[in-house]
Amino acid sequence: MLAIGEFMVKTLPLMEALKSLNLPGLERNLFSSPDWLTVLYKTYNCHLFVKYIEREGRIASYLIYCVVKNFLEWKICICSYCDYFDCYIERPDDWKLFFDALRKEYPQYRIAVRNLRDESARAFPEFKVLSQERFHFLDVRDPLEVVWKRTHDSFKSAVKQSQKIGVKVRKCEKKELRDFFQLHLDLRKNKYRLFPQPYRFFDYIWQQYMEKDRGGLLGAYDPDGRFIGGNIYLICGDTLYYKFNTSQLGSLKYRPNNLLFWEGIKFAKERNLNYLDLGSSGWNQEGLILFKNHTGAKSLDITHLGFTPPGYKFSQKRILKFMTRFFTTRWMPDFMLEWGSSIIYPYLA
């Protein structure tokens, strides 16, 4: 623990903190929830910690962070493998206490914060804006026909086209998770030249969510019954999270993504949920942003904030770039790419 000013900043490993502390607001969104953090811990062996401040016998403020120390960089990330991560901050001045504690404990580490709604983090003078992404969320509290009416005409047209062709969407069983993963691997390898997330990541998601009836994999099937796309939806609080999507290369004529999303809205309504979180989109992903806009969703900015200590040298990540290009060449067998992903992806925290 570290005494700074009037209050004590204390630290515990995350898994210990989840067992011994009453951390308020953990279920405020998916990324701060114990289920999601457990998936990250099991998949990537993340070094996750909690710093917290107590007042009047209760935890008043806390932040959850990942300590990253590898051949690529040294950093404190709030928080790795999350679209965004707003900390639980009671007073704006608490950011100063946490910042000073992190700087004292990790003087050579940069600090990275994925901020969506925490105004106190954006106002903290030590943090600089590094970049921004787009974030979308959809209010689905109105009757289904009203939600449908708010979608763009092009979205409606694509859904109707998909239905007319004969595409069917249904909730998948665990055995079909492999079909989803294969399309995910194909898309990342052949279209984007990126590592796929390792299969164990999706397997742990299934254990934490689908086996507890807190999510679902919706699969799209062409008229011949072939799996051509899928969406993974996760539930936290009153919100359904549109977490992962993939579709078969060359399946555009079937418009599976539009139908999958519409069925996701219906899934949210069936579970009496109020909102649909569409996640983040890079500003260069114009097609994805347009798709989300056409669902009737509203948008905000995810702001990447950071602090860099004097003399910090950013890695050029030449080894990572080489490995990525090498493993995603067209002649690379899929089992080799999957193996490479299981080794490399933990370094992408």
Q: Language model features by range: what are they?
A:
Residues C82, K96-A101, Y204-Q316:
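Aromatic (often tryptophan-rich) hydrophobic motifs at membrane interfaces
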Residues R91-P92, E173, S281:
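Short beta->alpha junction loops/turns
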